[in-house]
């Protein structure tokens, strides 16, 4: 069971980090400039990945790391829902996003600007990827990963009863 649990969390981390890799590919190879909401969704995927790695190696505190991974996912889902709603209603945005200054002032934007610096507009029309916008794909994957962590936590709790 322990080997299965470790593989379970490692797979979640791999998918999370892989999706950040897809975002970087779209940024550097396809020219999709990340907006502040995109960067915040990257933080959510990275949070899920890091907490899943910690859950894989720390059996005694696994539920804690799993819960924190779920919180990262829930925060990312909230951001992605808002982002998708902005794309569906572009007139709701004023064009200048005050969130950009805040995101770009974070230490991560200064340490790794290639990954965490936001210079795109949240309502910029970008070509769809496999028929959906990037924020829609982000929402789908954040939901899947968060649900996967939640199901694992529920199963774990049932096994201890």
Curated annotation (Swiss-Prot):
Disulfide bonds: 35-38, 94-122
Name by which UniProt lists this protein: Disulfide bond formation protein B
A cellular component annotation (GO) from this entry: plasma membrane
Residue ranges annotated as Cytoplasmic topological domain: 1-8, 59-63, 156-161
Cell compartments where the protein resides: Cell inner membrane
Domain of life where this protein originates: Bacteria
Keyword Ion transport: no
Main location: membrane
The UniProt record lists the keyword Transmembrane helix: yes
Record topology, Periplasmic segments: 26-43, 82-136
Role this protein plays: Required for disulfide bond formation in some periplasmic proteins. Acts by oxidizing the DsbA protein.
InterPro entries: DiS_bond_form_DsbB/BdbC, Disulphide_bond_form_DsbB, DsbB, DsbB-like_sf
Entry's family note: Belongs to the DsbB family.
Membrane topology: Multi-pass membrane protein
Species this protein is from: Cupriavidus necator (strain ATCC 17699 / DSM 428 / KCTC 22496 / NCIMB 10442 / H16 / Stanier 337) (Ralstonia eutropha)
Entry GO MF terms: electron transfer activity; protein-disulfide reductase activity
BP-aspect Gene Ontology terms: protein folding
Transmembrane segments: 9-25, 44-58, 64-81, 137-155
Keywords: Cell inner membrane, Cell membrane, Chaperone, Disulfide bond, Electron transport, Membrane, Oxidoreductase, Redox-active center, Transmembrane, Transmembrane helix, Transport
């Amino acid at each position: 069971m322990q080997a299965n649990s470790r593989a379970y969390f490692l797979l979640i981390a791999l998918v999370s980090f892989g999706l950040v890799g897809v975002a970087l590919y779209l940024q550097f190879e396809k020219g999709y400039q990340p907006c502040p909401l995109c960067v915040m969704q990257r933080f959510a995927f990275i949070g899920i990945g890091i907490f899943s790695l910690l859950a894989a190696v720390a059996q005694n505190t696994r539920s804690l790391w799993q819960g924190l991974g779920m919180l990262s996912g829930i925060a990312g889902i909230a951001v992605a829902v808002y982002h998708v709603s902005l794309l569906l209603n572009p007139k709701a945005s004023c064009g200048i996003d005050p969130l950009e200054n805040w995101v770009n002032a974070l230490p991560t934007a200064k340490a790794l600007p290639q990954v965490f610096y936001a210079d795109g507009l949240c309502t910029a029309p970008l070509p769809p990827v496999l028929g959906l916008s990037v924020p829609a794909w982000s929402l789908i994957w954040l939901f899947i990963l968060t649900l996967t962590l939640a199901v694992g936590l529920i199963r774990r709790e049932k096994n201890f009863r």
